[in-house]
Amino acid sequence: MRLIHTRTMDMEINGHEWWSWNGKTVWFDLQTPRSQVFWIAGVNVDTGKAVRYHIERDWWGVHFTSSRDDTLFANDGGDRSQVAYSTDGMWINLFREQPTQTVTREKLVNMSRHNYVTGRGGVEPNVHITPDKKWVVFTGQFAAGQRHVYAVEIAKVR
């Protein structure tokens, strides 16, 4: 067992970890502190080098993913009842890494009609970026009881 991230403050939370495609980086959602400052964070397991990309409150999502080269990230957004308490967070988001150690956000799909509340019949979108970086794939429930898999073409949204 190996420690990847150590908390640095009271109320700091991290979660929903995922591996980079090459297996060298553990990525995770980081909040310092909870519900206030948001990051896409990663730690290289070979070197221990950490990287953080700050994201705004409305950019936060429950589940994140990355492209094979870790230059694109996506998440599934969230509603007002979730930890970010965002007022405009119900989007499938795409983030592009910038040379300045930041990311830019692109809103791909308006999820305002989607039911995020799994305890009330909803579904978690659980986004994925295709290996060719052309699509973001996710599950959506835009009408009661109708869960489907969707794909949004990244290039078409730009």
What annotation goes with each model-predicted range?
Residues 1-60:
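Beta-propeller domains
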Residues 22-23, 69-70, 133:
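Conserved loop/turn motif of beta-propeller repeat scaffolds
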Residues 26-29, 72-76, 135-139:
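Residue position within the beta-strands of beta-propeller blades
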Residues 35-41, 54-107:
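Loop/turn-rich, solvent-exposed surfaces of beta-rich toroidal or solenoidal domains
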Residues 44-48, 98-100, 155:
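Short loop/turn segments that connect beta-strands within beta-propeller blades
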Residues 53-63, 102-131:
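Conserved blade-ending motifs and adjacent loop-strand segments that build the rim/top face
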Residues 123-158:
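Blade-level signature of beta-propeller repeat domains, shared across WD40, Kelch, NHL, RCC1
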